[in-house]
From Swiss-Prot:
Subcellular location: Mitochondrion inner membrane; Cytoplasm; Nucleus; Cell membrane
Subunit structure: The mitochondrial prohibitin complex consists of two subunits (PHB1 and PHB2), assembled into a membrane-associated ring-shaped supercomplex of approximately 1 mDa.
GO biological process: mitophagy
Protein name as annotated: Prohibitin-2
SMART domains in the cross-refs: PHB (SM00244)
Function comment: Protein with pleiotropic attributes mediated in a cell-compartment- and tissue-specific manner, which include the plasma membrane-associated cell signaling functions, mitochondrial chaperone, and transcriptional co-regulator of transcription factors and sex steroid hormones in the nucleus.
Pfam families: Band_7 (PF01145)
InterPro entries to which the protein is assigned, alphabetical: Band_7, Band_7/SPFH_dom_sf, Prohibitin
One GO cellular component term noted in the UniProt record for this chain: mitochondrial prohibitin complex
Protein family per UniProt: Belongs to the prohibitin family.
UniProt organism field: Xenopus tropicalis
Length: 301
């Protein structure tokens, strides 16, 4: 480039001697600035760089950290890698142990091993994740999922995820790739299997509902039996009380008469009824004779 500028300056028309000297100084300064610019480069945070020179190729023993670095222009140029963890989602259809088709989506956090960048560049280039991850994920998923039934993939999801992560991490080490996290984000089955599972769940819920109704009927029956036994015991106690104390029935009739009288007194309507039918005439002989006859009948029983 500097030589081209000098040739261009030589083709310009000749001028005063001072102007020619200034032009030469300007061209020299431009050449120096260009050389300095091409000799310096910066490695940003979270990145690493390796050198490729035009004679020996990739320099295996040089890995440049973050910051400002120098190089020989034209003879060397840097290759910069991003070594931060990057997420990637990979989906793979595979078959379970009971021959059910399963679609699994994994979220993988991957980054290159910084100490192996020269080796990685020679084998895989800069797009290492695109070349490696889809193939090894499919390989590991098929080998792991084939060990479980479709139902076990749901009930033992944590165990399946742990096994996938362990095998995938070991497999990625062969390509100098570090996996910081592997997680199952989606797990789906074929329409036929999903419909069969839903039908089974509905049948189980109906069976549980029927069992609940049977248990409820049994509890209601027991409650009625207990209630009937309680009413029978209460009737027996009343009968015993009548046989031992005839005045108990008279007391009950007096309380009933009081309740009837209170209800009629508080009513806005006025109704005239036979006093005998309302058992309000407590001084009448019929009241006493009626009570005594009931006590006699109860005693005979």
């Amino acid at each position: 480039m500097a030589q081209n500028l000098k040739d261009f300056a030589g083709r310009l028309p000749a001028g005063p001697r001072g102007m020619g000297t200034a032009m030469k100084l300007l061209l020299g300064a431009g050449a120096v600035a260009y050389a300095v610019k091409e000799s310096v480069f910066t490695v940003e945070g979270g990145h690493r760089a390796i050198f490729f020179n035009r004679i020996g190729g990739v320099q295996q023993d040089t890995i440049l950290a973050e910051g400002l670095h120098f190089r020989f222009p034209w003879f060397q140029y840097p290759i910069i890698y991003d070594i931060r963890a990057r997420p990637r989602k990979i989906s793979s259809p595979t078959g379970s142990k009971d021959l059910q088709m399963v679609n699994i989506t994994l979220r993988v956090l991957s980054r290159p091993l910084a100490s192996e960048l020269p080796f990685m560049y020679q084998r895989l280039g800069l797009d290492y994740d695109e070349r490696v991850l889809p193939s090894i994920v499919n390989e590991v998923l098929k080998s792991v999922v084939a060990k479980f039934n479709a139902s076990q993939l749901i009930t033992q999801r944590a165990q399946v995820s742990l096994l996938i992560r362990r095998e995938l991490t070991e497999r990625a080490k062969d390509f100098s790739i570090i996996l910081d996290d592997v997680a199952i984000t989606e797990l789906s089955f074929s329409r036929e299997y999903t419909a069969a599972v839903e039908s089974k769940q509905v049948a189980q819920q109906e069976a549980q509902r029927a069992q609940f109704l049977v248990e409820k009927a049994k509890q209601d029956q027991k409650q009625k039996i207990v209630q009937a036994e309680g009413e029978a015991a209460a009737a027996k106690m009343i009968g015993d009380a009548l046989s031992k104390n005839p005045g108990y029935l008279k007391l009950r009739r007096i309380r009933a008469a009081q309740s009837i009288a209170k209800t009629i007194a508080s009513s806005q309507n006025r109704v005239y009824l036979n006093a005998d039918s309302l058992v309000l005439n407590l001084q009448d002989d019929t009241f006493t004779r009626g009570s005594d006859s009931l006590v006699a009948k109860q005693t005979k029983k």
